[in-house]
């Protein structure tokens, strides 16, 4: 089966449990169509480059999917109907990344850089 990465943005006013529920709903849609979600990453609440439907921030969720094309079509149809989802994009990939995605690695790097700067500042 083809491999996909599906990223969607959820409204900023949702609770974390609702965001987790959106990811679970997407997973169940894929599994109903005989596909599987290999990995789910919730990148958290992030600033948007521009306002989307009056939202300045959004929760980012990424799914790595191994599923047939009709499962992806149904997932995208459901995303378009869901009012909590403000944007989504699905991309076909040749292979899934091993380990955390680039966004998750960037967050770890940013945290370590901040702690290094703080340590240098305190030492001075």
Curated annotation (Swiss-Prot):
CDD domains named among the record's database cross-references: bS6
Keyword Nucleus attributed: no
Entry's family note: Belongs to the bacterial ribosomal protein bS6 family.
Species this chain originates from: Zymomonas mobilis subsp. mobilis (strain ATCC 31821 / ZM4 / CP4)
An MF annotation (GO) of this entry: structural constituent of ribosome
GO cellular component: cytosolic small ribosomal subunit
Keywords in alphabetical order: Ribonucleoprotein, Ribosomal protein, RNA-binding, rRNA-binding
Pfam family, one: Ribosomal_S6
Region of interest (Disordered), residue spans: 97-124
Name of the protein in its database record: Small ribosomal subunit protein bS6
HAMAP family per the UniProt record, alphabetical: Ribosomal_bS6 (MF_00360)
Source domain of life: Bacteria
One annotated GO biological process: translation
InterPro entries: Ribosomal_bS6, Ribosomal_bS6_sf, Ribosomal_S6_plastid/chlpt, Transl_elong_EF1B/ribsomal_bS6
Function in brief: Binds together with bS18 to 16S ribosomal RNA.
Segments of skewed composition (Basic and acidic residues): 105-124
Keyword presence, DNA-binding: no
